């Protein structure tokens, strides 16, 4: 088989690949490439005391209204299961784990890119710049990681950047990180409701 016949065409989100080994077609690849990268960034940011202070402050509404957030979370989970059933998506333990992963990645990405990095950027080498530039840079990195770890197309990464800016704006207005995480979870599910399982995923 020659190189051209072995190549994989682009999917809805992912770029084409001349080498099938580079194409992300398994849940495990998403978990290792993207989940691990974003987790390391998020947990690394939480080593800074200034981030921990901001984190606990941003969760005040969650701690004060934990029952409400629990109900909203359960409602979102039920909606996701109903969505999968209505659109004839496969519903099994693997899919449930995927939904859980989407919640996890929403948590670590919001802690890392909406909360932590703008603070760290503006508190360190960007002191002479506006805090908004820290938000811009953080979301630029956020979109860039999707380009490299998930092999997303440039157009999808641009929308990811704009979506990140929107979430940053919502976080700036509400100062409620739990709310932003739930919004992120819902949007991410609608964008990628099922885990990759073959080379035709997302096409």
Which role fits each region the language model picked out?
Residues 91-203:
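Transmembrane helix-loop-helix hairpins at the membrane interface
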């Amino acid at each position: 088989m020659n190189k051209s016949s072995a190549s994989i065409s682009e999917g809805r989100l992912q770029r084409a690949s001349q080498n099938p080994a580079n194409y992300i077609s398994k849940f495990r690849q998403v978990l290792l490439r993207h989940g691990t990268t974003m987790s390391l960034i998020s947990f690394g940011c939480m080593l800074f005391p200034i981030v921990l202070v901001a984190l606990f402050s941003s969760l005040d509404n969650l701690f004060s209204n934990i029952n409400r957030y629990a109900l909203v979370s359960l409602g979102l989970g039920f909606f996701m299961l109903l969505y999968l059933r209505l659109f004839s998506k496969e519903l099994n333990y693997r899919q449930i784990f995927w939904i859980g992963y989407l919640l996890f990645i929403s948590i670590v990405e919001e802690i890392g890119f909406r909360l932590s990095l703008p603070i760290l950027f503006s508190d360190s080498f960007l002191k002479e710049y506006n805090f908004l530039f820290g938000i811009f840079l953080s979301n630029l990195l956020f979109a860039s990681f999707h380009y490299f770890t998930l092999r997303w197309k440039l157009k999808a990464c641009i929308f990811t950047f704009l979506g990140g800016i929107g979430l940053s704006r919502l976080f700036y207005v509400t100062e409620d990180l739990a709310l932003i995480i739930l919004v992120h979870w819902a949007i991410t599910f609608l964008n990628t409701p099922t885990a990759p399982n073959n080379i035709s995923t997302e096409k």
